[in-house]
Amino acid sequence: MFRLAVIVLASGALLAGAAQAQDAAGYPSRPVRIIVDVAPGGGVDTATRLVAAKLEQSLGQPFVVENRPGAAGSIGAEVVYTAEPDGYTLLASSPSPLAINQWLYKKLSYDPAGFQPIAMMSRIPNVLVVRSDFPAKTVQEAIAWLKVNPGKASFASQGVGTASHLTGVMLMKLTGTSMVHVPYKGTAPILTDIIAGHVDMTFIQVSNASVMHDAGKARILALATDKRLDFLPDIPTLAEVGLPISTDTWNAISAPPKMPAAIVAKLNAAVNAALRQPDVRKRLHDLKTIIGGDNGPAEAAKFVETERRQWGELVRAAGLEPQ
Protein backbone atom coordinates (compact mmCIF):
# COMPACT_ATOMS: atom_id res chain seq x y z
CA MET A 1 0.00 0.00 0.00
CA PHE A 2 2.81 2.40 0.92
CA ARG A 3 4.63 1.60 -2.34
CA LEU A 4 1.43 2.17 -4.31
CA ALA A 5 0.89 5.56 -2.61
CA VAL A 6 4.44 6.63 -3.47
CA ILE A 7 3.93 5.62 -7.09
CA VAL A 8 0.65 7.53 -7.27
CA LEU A 9 2.21 10.66 -5.73
CA ALA A 10 5.22 10.47 -8.03
CA SER A 11 2.98 10.01 -11.06
CA GLY A 12 0.92 13.02 -10.01
CA ALA A 13 4.04 15.16 -9.68
CA LEU A 14 5.26 14.07 -13.11
CA LEU A 15 1.90 14.84 -14.68
CA ALA A 16 1.79 18.26 -13.01
CA GLY A 17 5.29 19.02 -14.24
CA ALA A 18 4.40 17.92 -17.75
CA ALA A 19 1.28 20.10 -17.70
CA GLN A 20 3.29 23.12 -16.57
CA ALA A 21 5.85 22.56 -19.31
CA GLN A 22 3.06 22.28 -21.88
CA ASP A 23 1.48 25.50 -20.59
CA ALA A 24 4.82 27.30 -20.88
CA ALA A 25 5.40 25.97 -24.40
CA GLY A 26 2.18 27.63 -25.58
CA TYR A 27 2.68 30.80 -23.57
CA PRO A 28 1.77 33.48 -24.37
CA SER A 29 -1.20 32.85 -26.62
CA ARG A 30 -2.83 36.27 -26.09
CA PRO A 31 -1.83 39.80 -25.00
CA VAL A 32 -0.06 40.22 -21.65
CA ARG A 33 -0.64 43.19 -19.34
CA ILE A 34 2.27 44.70 -17.42
CA ILE A 35 0.94 46.87 -14.60
CA VAL A 36 3.32 49.71 -13.66
CA ASP A 37 2.80 51.09 -10.16
CA VAL A 38 3.80 54.68 -11.01
CA ALA A 39 2.69 57.33 -13.51
CA PRO A 40 4.12 57.46 -17.05
CA GLY A 41 7.39 59.24 -17.69
CA GLY A 42 9.65 58.08 -14.86
CA GLY A 43 12.58 55.68 -14.91
CA VAL A 44 10.56 52.62 -13.89
CA ASP A 45 7.99 53.29 -16.61
CA THR A 46 10.63 53.93 -19.29
CA ALA A 47 12.61 50.76 -18.53
CA THR A 48 9.42 48.71 -18.51
CA ARG A 49 8.33 49.99 -21.91
CA LEU A 50 11.74 49.24 -23.42
CA VAL A 51 11.63 45.67 -22.15
CA ALA A 52 7.95 45.20 -23.09
CA ALA A 53 8.72 46.08 -26.71
CA LYS A 54 11.41 43.39 -26.82
CA LEU A 55 9.14 40.82 -25.18
CA GLU A 56 6.59 41.40 -27.93
CA GLN A 57 9.26 40.60 -30.51
CA SER A 58 10.63 37.51 -28.79
CA LEU A 59 7.39 35.99 -27.49
CA GLY A 60 5.08 36.97 -30.34
CA GLN A 61 2.25 38.63 -28.41
CA PRO A 62 1.54 42.23 -27.36
CA PHE A 63 2.87 43.21 -23.92
CA VAL A 64 0.65 46.13 -22.96
CA VAL A 65 2.02 48.53 -20.34
CA GLU A 66 -0.73 49.88 -18.09
CA ASN A 67 0.03 52.55 -15.48
CA ARG A 68 -1.85 52.22 -12.17
CA PRO A 69 -0.27 54.80 -9.85
CA GLY A 70 -1.47 55.74 -6.39
CA ALA A 71 -1.29 54.69 -2.73
CA ALA A 72 2.50 54.21 -2.96
CA GLY A 73 2.10 51.48 -5.57
CA SER A 74 -0.56 49.54 -3.67
CA ILE A 75 -3.23 50.12 -6.32
CA GLY A 76 -1.20 48.50 -9.08
CA ALA A 77 0.10 45.78 -6.77
CA GLU A 78 -3.43 44.73 -5.77
CA VAL A 79 -4.47 44.41 -9.43
CA VAL A 80 -1.67 41.91 -10.04
CA TYR A 81 -1.86 40.11 -6.70
CA THR A 82 -5.52 39.22 -7.23
CA ALA A 83 -5.10 38.27 -10.91
CA GLU A 84 -5.02 34.72 -12.19
CA PRO A 85 -1.45 33.34 -11.94
CA ASP A 86 -1.41 32.44 -15.62
CA GLY A 87 1.27 34.86 -16.84
CA TYR A 88 -1.10 37.35 -18.45
CA THR A 89 -0.97 39.99 -15.70
CA LEU A 90 2.47 41.04 -14.44
CA LEU A 91 3.75 43.78 -12.14
CA ALA A 92 6.61 46.16 -12.93
CA SER A 93 7.21 47.90 -9.65
CA SER A 94 9.30 50.38 -7.76
CA PRO A 95 10.43 49.42 -4.23
CA SER A 96 7.27 50.68 -2.52
CA PRO A 97 4.71 47.87 -2.98
CA LEU A 98 7.18 45.01 -2.54
CA ALA A 99 9.61 46.33 0.08
CA ILE A 100 8.32 49.47 1.82
CA ASN A 101 4.55 49.54 2.26
CA GLN A 102 4.37 46.73 4.80
CA TRP A 103 6.38 48.88 7.21
CA LEU A 104 4.11 51.91 6.80
CA TYR A 105 0.61 50.46 6.70
CA LYS A 106 -1.02 48.13 9.23
CA LYS A 107 -3.31 46.67 6.59
CA LEU A 108 -2.54 46.02 2.94
CA SER A 109 -4.82 44.48 0.33
CA TYR A 110 -2.01 42.11 -0.69
CA ASP A 111 0.92 40.24 0.84
CA PRO A 112 4.21 41.80 -0.37
CA ALA A 113 6.02 38.52 0.23
CA GLY A 114 3.43 36.62 -1.79
CA PHE A 115 4.49 37.89 -5.21
CA GLN A 116 6.66 35.69 -7.42
CA PRO A 117 9.69 37.77 -8.52
CA ILE A 118 10.63 37.07 -12.14
CA ALA A 119 13.64 39.32 -12.79
CA MET A 120 15.32 42.55 -11.78
CA MET A 121 15.29 45.03 -14.67
CA SER A 122 17.09 48.13 -13.47
CA ARG A 123 18.35 50.24 -10.60
CA ILE A 124 18.36 54.03 -10.68
CA PRO A 125 20.27 56.03 -8.05
CA ASN A 126 18.33 58.82 -6.34
CA VAL A 127 19.64 62.38 -6.11
CA LEU A 128 18.74 65.54 -4.20
CA VAL A 129 17.41 68.15 -6.63
CA VAL A 130 16.42 71.77 -5.97
CA ARG A 131 14.66 74.33 -8.16
CA SER A 132 17.05 76.43 -10.22
CA ASP A 133 16.70 79.57 -8.06
CA PHE A 134 16.79 77.88 -4.66
CA PRO A 135 18.96 80.01 -2.31
CA ALA A 136 21.74 77.44 -1.87
CA LYS A 137 24.51 76.26 -4.18
CA THR A 138 25.69 73.26 -2.14
CA VAL A 139 24.03 70.68 0.08
CA GLN A 140 25.75 72.23 3.11
CA GLU A 141 24.26 75.63 2.23
CA ALA A 142 20.85 74.03 1.70
CA ILE A 143 20.90 72.41 5.14
CA ALA A 144 22.01 75.68 6.75
CA TRP A 145 19.13 77.51 5.01
CA LEU A 146 16.61 74.88 6.10
CA LYS A 147 17.76 75.17 9.71
CA VAL A 148 17.09 78.92 9.85
CA ASN A 149 13.87 78.60 7.83
CA PRO A 150 11.99 75.69 9.46
CA GLY A 151 8.85 74.64 7.63
CA LYS A 152 9.29 77.18 4.83
CA ALA A 153 10.63 74.82 2.17
CA SER A 154 8.63 72.12 0.39
CA PHE A 155 9.86 68.76 -0.80
CA ALA A 156 8.08 66.66 -3.39
CA SER A 157 7.87 62.88 -3.47
CA GLN A 158 6.28 60.17 -5.60
CA GLY A 159 3.80 59.54 -2.80
CA VAL A 160 3.64 58.76 0.90
CA GLY A 161 5.88 55.82 1.72
CA THR A 162 7.83 55.88 -1.54
CA ALA A 163 11.62 55.86 -1.70
CA SER A 164 11.66 59.58 -2.47
CA HIS A 165 9.45 60.33 0.55
CA LEU A 166 11.47 58.22 2.99
CA THR A 167 14.75 59.64 1.73
CA GLY A 168 13.44 63.14 2.38
CA VAL A 169 12.27 62.13 5.86
CA MET A 170 15.72 60.75 6.65
CA LEU A 171 17.34 64.00 5.47
CA MET A 172 15.15 66.01 7.84
CA LYS A 173 15.73 63.62 10.74
CA LEU A 174 19.51 63.57 10.36
CA THR A 175 19.80 67.35 9.93
CA GLY A 176 17.16 68.45 12.43
CA THR A 177 15.24 70.36 9.77
CA SER A 178 11.60 70.45 8.71
CA MET A 179 9.93 70.82 5.33
CA VAL A 180 6.39 70.60 3.97
CA HIS A 181 5.87 67.26 2.20
CA VAL A 182 4.04 67.45 -1.14
CA PRO A 183 3.15 63.95 -2.46
CA TYR A 184 2.63 63.29 -6.18
CA LYS A 185 1.64 60.19 -8.16
CA GLY A 186 4.80 59.97 -10.22
CA THR A 187 7.99 61.62 -11.41
CA ALA A 188 6.70 63.59 -14.41
CA PRO A 189 4.45 65.98 -12.42
CA ILE A 190 7.27 66.52 -9.91
CA LEU A 191 9.59 67.59 -12.71
CA THR A 192 6.99 70.03 -14.02
CA ASP A 193 6.55 71.68 -10.64
CA ILE A 194 10.27 71.78 -9.80
CA ILE A 195 10.93 73.56 -13.10
CA ALA A 196 8.03 75.95 -12.48
CA GLY A 197 9.28 76.64 -8.95
CA HIS A 198 6.11 75.38 -7.24
CA VAL A 199 8.14 73.06 -4.97
CA ASP A 200 11.65 73.58 -3.66
CA MET A 201 13.31 70.19 -3.75
CA THR A 202 12.90 66.47 -4.23
CA PHE A 203 14.72 63.16 -4.24
CA ILE A 204 14.21 61.60 -7.66
CA GLN A 205 15.99 59.25 -10.02
CA VAL A 206 19.20 60.57 -11.53
CA SER A 207 17.92 59.59 -14.99
CA ASN A 208 15.29 62.33 -14.79
CA ALA A 209 17.25 64.82 -12.71
CA SER A 210 20.34 64.90 -14.92
CA VAL A 211 18.32 66.16 -17.91
CA MET A 212 17.01 69.13 -15.90
CA HIS A 213 20.43 69.71 -14.35
CA ASP A 214 22.19 69.81 -17.73
CA ALA A 215 19.54 72.19 -19.11
CA GLY A 216 19.86 74.55 -16.14
CA LYS A 217 16.20 74.04 -15.19
CA ALA A 218 17.07 72.55 -11.78
CA ARG A 219 20.20 71.68 -9.83
CA ILE A 220 21.49 68.42 -8.40
CA LEU A 221 23.08 69.12 -5.03
CA ALA A 222 23.98 65.62 -3.85
CA LEU A 223 23.77 61.91 -4.60
CA ALA A 224 21.95 59.43 -2.37
CA THR A 225 24.56 56.81 -3.26
CA ASP A 226 27.51 55.09 -1.59
CA LYS A 227 30.00 56.60 -4.02
CA ARG A 228 30.16 59.26 -6.72
CA LEU A 229 28.82 58.48 -10.18
CA ASP A 230 31.10 58.45 -13.22
CA PHE A 231 28.72 60.61 -15.23
CA LEU A 232 28.35 63.20 -12.42
CA PRO A 233 31.90 63.28 -11.03
CA ASP A 234 31.59 66.74 -9.48
CA ILE A 235 28.44 66.01 -7.47
CA PRO A 236 29.16 64.83 -3.90
CA THR A 237 27.37 62.06 -2.08
CA LEU A 238 25.34 62.81 1.03
CA ALA A 239 27.73 60.54 2.91
CA GLU A 240 30.56 62.96 2.11
CA VAL A 241 28.80 65.64 4.16
CA GLY A 242 28.10 63.30 7.05
CA LEU A 243 24.66 62.03 6.01
CA PRO A 244 24.66 58.22 5.56
CA ILE A 245 21.75 58.10 3.11
CA SER A 246 21.86 55.71 0.14
CA THR A 247 18.70 54.75 -1.76
CA ASP A 248 17.95 53.37 -5.21
CA THR A 249 14.72 53.21 -7.17
CA TRP A 250 14.79 49.71 -8.59
CA ASN A 251 12.45 48.04 -11.03
CA ALA A 252 11.43 44.40 -10.72
CA ILE A 253 9.08 42.27 -12.80
CA SER A 254 6.87 40.08 -10.61
CA ALA A 255 3.92 37.73 -10.98
CA PRO A 256 0.90 36.83 -8.84
CA PRO A 257 1.38 34.10 -6.24
CA LYS A 258 1.58 30.49 -7.44
CA MET A 259 2.37 31.19 -11.08
CA PRO A 260 3.79 28.02 -12.69
CA ALA A 261 7.58 27.84 -12.42
CA ALA A 262 7.91 27.03 -16.12
CA ILE A 263 6.21 30.31 -17.12
CA VAL A 264 8.32 32.22 -14.58
CA ALA A 265 11.46 30.70 -16.12
CA LYS A 266 10.34 31.52 -19.67
CA LEU A 267 9.64 35.15 -18.77
CA ASN A 268 12.91 35.44 -16.85
CA ALA A 269 14.88 34.26 -19.87
CA ALA A 270 13.00 36.67 -22.16
CA VAL A 271 13.50 39.67 -19.84
CA ASN A 272 17.22 38.95 -19.46
CA ALA A 273 17.55 38.56 -23.23
CA ALA A 274 15.82 41.92 -23.72
CA LEU A 275 18.22 43.60 -21.30
CA ARG A 276 21.17 42.25 -23.29
CA GLN A 277 20.02 43.93 -26.51
CA PRO A 278 22.47 46.70 -27.54
CA ASP A 279 19.75 49.29 -28.22
CA VAL A 280 18.10 48.65 -24.84
CA ARG A 281 21.45 48.85 -23.04
CA LYS A 282 22.34 52.10 -24.79
CA ARG A 283 19.00 53.69 -23.98
CA LEU A 284 19.19 52.67 -20.32
CA HIS A 285 22.80 53.82 -20.11
CA ASP A 286 21.79 57.19 -21.57
CA LEU A 287 19.16 57.37 -18.82
CA LYS A 288 21.87 56.81 -16.17
CA THR A 289 20.29 53.48 -15.28
CA ILE A 290 22.14 50.49 -13.82
CA ILE A 291 21.01 47.43 -15.79
CA GLY A 292 19.95 44.44 -13.71
CA GLY A 293 19.95 41.67 -16.31
CA ASP A 294 21.22 38.07 -16.14
CA ASN A 295 19.58 37.26 -12.82
CA GLY A 296 17.33 34.32 -12.10
CA PRO A 297 14.03 34.30 -10.21
CA ALA A 298 15.77 33.08 -7.04
CA GLU A 299 18.27 35.94 -7.24
CA ALA A 300 15.48 38.44 -7.80
CA ALA A 301 13.58 37.07 -4.80
CA LYS A 302 16.68 37.29 -2.61
CA PHE A 303 17.30 40.89 -3.71
CA VAL A 304 13.72 41.92 -2.92
CA GLU A 305 13.86 40.23 0.49
CA THR A 306 17.11 42.04 1.33
CA GLU A 307 15.58 45.34 0.23
CA ARG A 308 12.47 44.64 2.30
CA ARG A 309 14.60 44.19 5.41
CA GLN A 310 16.73 47.28 4.73
CA TRP A 311 13.74 49.53 4.06
CA GLY A 312 12.19 48.30 7.31
CA GLU A 313 15.32 49.44 9.12
CA LEU A 314 15.17 52.81 7.36
CA VAL A 315 11.49 53.31 8.26
CA ARG A 316 12.21 52.56 11.90
CA ALA A 317 15.26 54.84 11.88
CA ALA A 318 13.07 57.61 10.47
CA GLY A 319 10.72 57.18 13.41
CA LEU A 320 7.69 56.36 11.25
CA GLU A 321 4.90 54.23 12.71
CA PRO A 322 2.52 52.05 10.65
CA GLN A 323 -0.75 53.82 10.02
Predicted feature residues:
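Short, low-complexity disordered leader/linker segments with a strong preference
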Residues: 1-29, 140, 323
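N-terminal (or domain-start) structured segment
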Residues: 21-113, 152, 173-203, 212, ...
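An extracytoplasmic/periplasmic, membrane-proximal ligand-sensing/linker region
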Residues: 29-31, 173, 261-323
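Extracytoplasmic/secreted proteins, especially bacterial periplasmic and envelope-associated proteins
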Residues: 46, 50, 54, 75, ...
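Hinge/capping helix and adjacent helix->loop/strand transition within the periplasmic-binding protein
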Residues: 82-88, 103-189, 238, 243, ...
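Short secondary-structure boundary segments
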Residues: 94-95, 132, 206-207, 225-226, ...
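Short beta-strand->loop
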Residues: 111-120, 156, 178-182, 200, ...
